[in-house]
UniProtKB/Swiss-Prot annotation:
Disordered, as annotated region: 18-42, 124-159, 368-399, 433-458, 575-664, 693-747
Protein name in the entry: E3 ubiquitin-protein ligase SH3RF3
GO BP field: positive regulation of JNK cascade; positive regulation of proteasomal ubiquitin-dependent protein catabolic process; protein autoubiquitination; protein ubiquitination
Single GO molecular function: zinc ion binding
Reactions it catalyzes: S-ubiquitinyl-[E2 ubiquitin-conjugating enzyme]-L-cysteine + [acceptor protein]-L-lysine = [E2 ubiquitin-conjugating enzyme]-L-cysteine + N(6)-ubiquitinyl-[acceptor protein]-L-lysine
Oligomeric form and interacting partners: Interacts (via SH3 domain 3) with PAK2. Interacts with RAC1 (GTP-bound form).
Function (record text): Has E3 ubiquitin-protein ligase activity.
Species for this entry: Homo sapiens
Domain text: The RING finger domain is required for ubiquitin ligase activity and autoubiquitination.
Residue span of region Interaction with RAC1: 369-439
Enzyme class: transferase
Zinc finger (RING-type): 57-98
PTM annotation: Autoubiquitinated.
Gene: SH3RF3
Amino acid sequence: MLLGASWLCASKAAAAAAQSEGDEDRPGERRRRRAAATAAGAGEDMDESSLLDLLECSVCLERLDTTAKVLPCQHTFCRRCLESIVCSRHELRCPECRILVGCGVDELPANILLVRLLDGIRQRPRAGTSPGGSPPARPIPGQSAAPTLAGGGGGAAGSTPGSPVFLSAAAGSTAGSLRELATSRTAPAAKNPCLLPYGKALYSYEGKEPGDLKFNKGDIIVLRRKVDEQWYHGELHGTQGFLPASYIQCIQPLPHAPPQGKALYDFEMKDKDQDKDCLTFTKDEILTVLRRVDENWAEGMLGDKIGIFPLLYVELNDSAKQLIEMDKPCPAAASSCNASLPSDSGAVASVAPSPTLSSSGAVSAFQRRVDGKKNTKKRHSFTALSVTHRSSQAASHRHSMEISAPVLISSSDPRAAARIGDLAHLSCAAPTQDVSSSAGSTPTAVPRAASVSGEQGTPPKVQLPLNVYLALYAYKPQKSDELELHKGEMYRVLEKCQDGWFKGASLRTGVSGVFPGNYVTPVSRVPAGGAGPPRNNVVGGSPLAKGITTTMHPGSGSLSSLATATRPALPITTPQAHAQHPTASPPTGSCLRHSAQPTASQARSTISTAAHSAAQAQDRPTATVSPLRTQNSPSRLPATSLRPHSVVSPQHSHQPPVQMCPRPAIPLTSAASAITPPNVSAANLNGEAGGGPIGVLSTSSPTNTGCKLDEKKSEKKEKKSGLLKLLAGASTKKKSRSPPSVSPTHDPQVAVDALLQGAVGPEVSSLSIHGRAGSCPIESEMQGAMGMEPLHRKAGSLDLNFTSPSRQAPLSMAAIRPEPKLLPRERYRVVVSYPPQSEAEIELKEGDIVFVHKKREDGWYKGTLQRNGRTGLFPGSFVESF
């Protein structure tokens, strides 16, 4: 902006000033003062009056004050001159460039930089000595004060009577006061080194490499900056170089370095309009950190731009780390889910501060100015427990993914899920969880996820960290900071980057690094066919002996292992049990609601003897979970009996318990796994379990407690042969699938019907009413998408949100069940081809027609391809409605 005038304009203004004030000699006197001040710059320091003479109006040559206005052409004039021009010419044109101004004088903005400079001059100490007590040093010959007006930049504008004076509006000139800018001049420091940080040499140093500073013992070395804990960059006799910190005694320490950070990655935003308050940068750029916004975001400045950026993208120096720690938000009340491993062991290199001493003061002044301005645009992180905050925030805000939120990004390209900003997705994917079992036999102690309290409102007893993930695929690192993934191993996730990459550490080796997020899945949502063996409570590190059952409340969910969580199967009763109590049965379509959550002590006290189990089983009906073999596990689970808690009426106490023996496990790759939900084992389809509130099996009646073991074995052999026949016939129709874990959704209504009746046989058609604890798409769910009614409900992530139990389900009920109804469909056209990345996904080719059945909140759709009739998942951005 132009503050000085050419002498042509000055001559015109001289007449106006003489006419208004009657002082014709004033312009000439002012010119003489300016020339004298310029000449005095060669021998003495420029005083305050000479500085103020440079800040004058180019029309009237009067000193500018805070009422000066800036025109759209960036020229600044005093208010009185602008008003006189409007009164005389009835329009406002710039006296310098003659550009017409379309607004009034009152609507013009003030010169903010001028206001700050004037304020700094007023606050400047007027004493004859400097703040340090020594007389003010004189500048070296030939140096003018013009660089101080431009933030230390070069140029001597305004030093000659014929040149205009400019004030730069760049970000480098946003100093808090003129005093801070004046101290950045290096010439006074050369005369008086006590004003600069310096140290005294304790030993002589000859220098070992080019660029080292040589000095002798006793030399006074000016310290320019601190490279790291071991080295300084200093100056001695006009020579600069590096010197070891142990060789000098620091007498005047370096000032506090400005909080800065070095960009580790490129940070760009796709939606410029929505994310206009984000600060974009490229790798290796140096940012100035202003303040912390929330757990994962900070506000910074790069050049003349101010915005927020993710902390994971920037390597902070010590000052920035202290600033971030100072502004760290208070942890939530229930913060046990946020436990994490120690961070990376690699030391963070300090970023070299700016060599000018005024940069720290300028940044601090700028920070104070913008601190209140950006509060209205701050973005918040939402943990898995802050349900109230999640529900109250707008979905348009950017929400930082916490390490406690088990969000799985199912995509081959980790950058494809960079924009996960939907608030409801976080509320669905990160429910609070309870611990159901604490006993284990493996040497690695890993927290195991169990059932979820969900929406019942029951407070959780024990919080479980959700940042333990299982590797679904092997990954070879491509860069030095990446972590190698081994399929089936466990990893602790420390941070989640916006581009879909995770930062974590291996629980086996402790090595940390970054890896793609779609290669791992949370332990709490590992599918039943996961890579690890399901574990039960053990005694002495081995499974329980035959005939011993483990009792637990169904509210406790499951006995989870490192790799998978075994869901509790719903109890199965016999026709005899229903015939005794026909009036106690709610409608068949109702579901079991868990009304109580277990404590950790209940889970630990589940191991009991056979006699104790039988005594407990006489109080409440029991259901059994048969042994289940995973794909990679050679071991089997012992029989587990579950009893409904505060749901079953005491009048059923006469029902005898059923004791189970381990049976040959059925691999999940068989047809039974494709048609059996993960919370009902394949052995249950053959009628092993007896005594439960729902489901009917006509194969056998429950025996009393005095039944001998050999009789049971003979019955089981017959049932086993029947089951194998059924599986042999179904295996030709079904294809085993092992889809990856996906984010859960909430369905408001669920209708369960006889899908198994046509796939396996009428014998197991009664086993159709149950709740599914997970949300992995299985074969039966894919059949439901093709037009059949779904076999089970998806009630949130690990949420067994059932209604009341069904006490009666005779075989005759199957005849009056409603017919399967078609799911809603929407026609979509594929606009971009998409290759499937897992068995749960379908291949899309450009131009294909897809019938969409469900739109998930993470942007993925489930639908059926018209070309081949296949049903599966695909990203919604690859299709369009028509």
